[in-house]
Amino acid sequence: MPTYSPKAGDVTRQWYVIDATDVVLGRLAVQAANLLRGKNKPTYAPHVDGGDFVIIINAEKVAISGNKRQDKLIHHHSGHPGGLKSRTVGQVLETRPERLVEKAVKGMIPKNKLGNAIAGKLKVYAGPNHPHAAQQPVPFEIKQVAQ
């Protein structure tokens, strides 16, 4: 009997919703990245997009451990000379909390075409509401919360 190799058409996808309230950002990102890649499934293969859809709600209430809220800087560049912009994690969390969570999760998936397809299945919302009720997402609980 030959070894089973999953194909793109063999995948059945499920929708998960994760509440980010009082969950440490890194632990949230690890769990979300594993669900997106399909590492929780017995048919996991690194060359196939076999993961599930992940909805993260309450991104504004995510926990940041240590002094990272005021000490850690997030950089981006406009592309023009002298166009390096820097903001602290706390500033980003106040203005666009969904971007902070997206950046943390996308940093844990591959940086290639497959990674872009995987990142497309991530939906992040700052508040408790999301427009994906028709997909009947299953709640996914992260047991380790911040003290």
Swiss-Prot record:
Keywords: Ribonucleoprotein, Ribosomal protein
Gene it is expressed from: rplM
Assigned GO CC terms: cytosolic large ribosomal subunit
PROSITE patterns: RIBOSOMAL_L13
CDD domains in the cross-refs: Ribosomal_L13
Family, per entry: Belongs to the universal ribosomal protein uL13 family.
Molecular function GO labels: mRNA binding; structural constituent of ribosome
InterPro entries: Ribosomal_uL13, Ribosomal_uL13_bac-type, Ribosomal_uL13_CS, Ribosomal_uL13_sf
HAMAP family (alphabetical): Ribosomal_uL13
Subunit-level organization: Part of the 50S ribosomal subunit.
Pfam families, per the entry: Ribosomal_L13 (PF00572)
Protein name from the UniProt record: Large ribosomal subunit protein uL13
Function of the protein: This protein is one of the early assembly proteins of the 50S ribosomal subunit, although it is not seen to bind rRNA by itself. It is important during the early stages of 50S assembly.
GO biological-process terms attached to the record: negative regulation of translation; translation
Entry-linked Gene3D superfamilies: Ribosomal protein L13 (3.90.1180.10)
